[in-house]
Amino acid sequence: MKILFLNYIDESGAGKACLKIIESLKKKKIKCDYKVKIKIKNNNYSKTIDYKNPIKIENYKKKFNRIFSRLANKSIKSFQSPSLFGSNYYKFINNSDYDLVHLVWINGLLSIEDIGKINKPIVWTFADMWPFTGINHYDSDNNKAFWKKKIF
């Protein structure tokens, strides 16, 4: 079995947890690759994604996502990313020889639409609240449920 782990940055808490999983799997002789958009740690596991979008496009995406996040709901004060734009990275995944894709923290890496285009089995570790809120990474909620606030 060959597993692809996808994470935004290897320095985060999710990235550190991902590395522990990979180290455990490698001890069991399971082939794993760890692809990140931003590589900070000096290790033998994480490799930078070959991400071919021009810098200008990336900057426009970031600006649009920031503006959209501010306009979407001003009552939300936590870190947000709507991930409206994907990366076409799913094409690499679909054309690869990986048997399984493990998504970790994919902010800005894949959109929900991109995830739906992956034709490999997916395991998704919910390292934050984004997969089920659609925009927030974390919200302390202060004992008030999202659905009671009706902010979706």
Which role does the model predict for each range below?
Residues 1-152:
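Catalytic cores of nucleotide-sugar-dependent glycosyltransferases that transfer UDP/GDP/TDP-activated
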